[in-house]
Amino acid sequence: MAGNFWQSSHYLQWILDKERQKDLKFLSEEEYWKLQIFFTNVIQALGEHLKLRQQVIATATVYFKRFYARYSLKSIDPVLMAPTCVFLASKVEEFGVVSNTSLIAATTSVLKTRFSYASPKEFPYRMNHILECEFYLLELMDCCLIVYHPYRPLLQYVQDMGQEDVLLPLAWRIVNDTYRTDLCLLYPPFMIALACLHVACVVQQKDARQWFAELSVDMEKILEIIRVILKLYEQWKNFDERKEMATILSKMPKPKPPPNSEGEQGPNGSQNSSYSQS
């Protein structure tokens, strides 16, 4: 892994300004946010089914968000992109390559057992589609595959505070939850870690004002992140995924269905030129 975040492709190319998506022509901002939560949950469930480490799952989630920050949902079916991101992340994070059979079986099982209310049909893709989708994902990211996460700085901060046993479990869960937002595309990981730690301190009623005051960090940025986290929890508690997702998915702009045979088509059945959308 690259040793310096500030010189890494993560910082130089993938800390993005927030932009409206083309998909907001079809979906409200709230519906788009719910779609992002849904597919983050799919990636999480798939990673857990495959017994992947949380960092692998987090990296897969970042890949997914990077792709759809630059391309419409219409370009490649997110149901295909989700396992593709897991497949690539498992290799990049040196977990080991997930076998073709295991990946397809796990995706089919997770969609059928955990998300049948939103995806009643069989998983329509095979490994050749995932491998082709991986090519487009790599092309978009220009092979910039190293992802920095808030977990390591969070651990260092909590140890520095001397509150590891009290604060780390809650702050870690909050970091996991931030992947259901776009924070990983908008802010450096150390800032996300500090924001999650701040929320954990408030919840656990730990006075850390002096510790935060001594940091050389833009606290306005930290407060921006905290507001996003609090908004996530406020909206999340009112989100009935089982009731709402089928309708939202039906409004999502759709790519063409997968081809019946291999050829010069992309993984969603469209010609390669359809991947030039921005």
From Swiss-Prot:
SUPFAM superfamilies: Cyclin-like (SSF47954). Residues 267-278 have a biased composition (Polar residues). It comes from Rattus norvegicus (Rat). It is found in: Nucleus. Belongs to the cyclin family. Cyclin C subfamily. This is Cyclin-C. Component of the Mediator complex, which is composed of MED1, MED4, MED6, MED7, MED8, MED9, MED10, MED11, MED12, MED13, MED13L, MED14, MED15, MED16, MED17, MED18, MED19, MED20, MED21, MED22, MED23, MED24, MED25, MED26, MED27, MED29, MED30, MED31, CCNC, CDK8 and CDC2L6/CDK11. The MED12, MED13, CCNC and CDK8 subunits form a distinct module termed the CDK8 module. Mediator containing the CDK8 module is less active than Mediator lacking this module in supporting transcriptional activation. One of its GO terms (biological process) is negative regulation of Notch signaling pathway. The keyword Transcription regulation applies. It holds the Pfam family Cyclin_C_2. Residues 247-278 are annotated as: Disordered. Keywords: Activator, Cyclin, Nucleus, Phosphoprotein, Repressor, Transcription, Transcription regulation. Residues 41-139 form the Cyclin N-terminal domain. InterPro entries: Cyclin-like_dom, Cyclin-like_sf, Cyclin/Ssn8, Cyclin_C_2, Cyclin_N. The modification Phosphoserine is found at residue 270. It comes from the Eukaryota. The keyword Lipoprotein does not apply. GO terms for molecular function: cyclin-dependent protein serine/threonine kinase regulator activity; identical protein binding. Signal peptide: none annotated. Component of the Mediator complex, a coactivator involved in regulated gene transcription of nearly all RNA polymerase II-dependent genes. Mediator functions as a bridge to convey information from gene-specific regulatory proteins to the basal RNA polymerase II transcription machinery. Mediator is recruited to promoters by direct interactions with regulatory proteins and serves as a scaffold for the assembly of a functional preinitiation complex with RNA polymerase II and the general transcription factors. GO terms for cellular component: CKM complex; cyclin-dependent protein kinase holoenzyme complex; mediator complex; nucleus; ubiquitin ligase complex.
